[in-house]
């Protein structure tokens, strides 16, 4: 739900959708947090924690970062991924991340769920790019290893595995806005990037006055005015200063990526 509200805000400009997403995230953090930055399903999880709950919040934090550029959300997404790696790791290499770290009963040991592993690949691969951290790329690769086994990949309704494989093997479209948050042109470029939001896309905003470590390792030229860059796995655009040009820039990059 949080990710859906973020997408609605991005493409429509509905600020109330972002407010709802942020309130939902705050409520879950307040009432469902676990030690170690995971999340529980209810007030008590007799058989938990469950992979799906922390995975959903990791996805939510990453989408909130994408629309707000608030790096606190990016850090929270990373902590969720760390919890997943620590608590739901495959019981054997290539066996898939398990749904729960606790047996539901003696006859039903923890097992992997295909859809959860698909979602994990897509989340972890995007996060790996967003923070330039190989640990999350390895997390995605391990989940993909399970999905690629013939007994899993050839089951009916396997289109999600193709999406996961595509996300894991290709870098997301990477839009970066350079400019101070109070500069009208930088704000307009960010809004244009949100309205043109594509699947498997990362939006980053760099404030020249912010000297904290950057999440990604892509270098850009120093400019004396706000600008937007769009990068693929192989190239970056020239700086764009006109918000109205952004949709066409994204469409062209999507075409070249296919």
Residue ranges of model-derived segments:
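Glycan-recognition and catalytic cores of secretory/periplasmic carbohydrate-active enzymes
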Residues: 1-258
């Amino acid at each position: 739900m949080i990710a859906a509200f973020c997408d609605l805000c991005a493409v429509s400009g509905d600020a109330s959708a972002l407010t709802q997403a942020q309130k939902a995230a705050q409520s879950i953090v307040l009432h469902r947090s676990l030690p170690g930055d995971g999340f529980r399903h209810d007030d008590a999880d007799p058989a938990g924690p469950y992979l799906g709950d922390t995975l959903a919040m990791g996805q939510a934090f990453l989408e909130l970062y994408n629309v707000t550029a608030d790096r606190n959300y990016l850090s929270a997404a990373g902590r969720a991924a760390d919890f997943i790696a620590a608590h739901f790791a495959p019981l054997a290499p290539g066996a898939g991340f398990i749904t729960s770290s606790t047996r539901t009963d003696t006859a039903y040991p923890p097992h992997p769920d295909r859809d959860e592993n698909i979602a994990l690949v897509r989340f972890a691969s995007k996060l790996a790019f967003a923070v330039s951290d190989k640990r999350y790329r390895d997390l995605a690769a391990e989940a993909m290893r399970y999905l690629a086994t013939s007994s899993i990949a050839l089951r009916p309704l396997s289109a999600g595995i193709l999406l996961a494989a595509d996300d894991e093997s290709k870098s997301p479209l990477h839009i970066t806005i350079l400019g101070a948050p109070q500069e009208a042109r930088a704000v307009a470029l960010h809004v244009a990037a949100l309205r043109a939001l594509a699947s498997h896309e990362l939006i980053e905003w760099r404030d020249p006055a912010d000297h904290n470590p950057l999440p990604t390792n892509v270098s850009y030229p120093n400019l004396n005015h706000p600008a937007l860059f769009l990068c693929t796995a192989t190239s970056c655009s020239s700086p764009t200063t006109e918000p109205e040009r952004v949709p066409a820039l994204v469409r062209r990059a999507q075409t070249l990526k296919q």
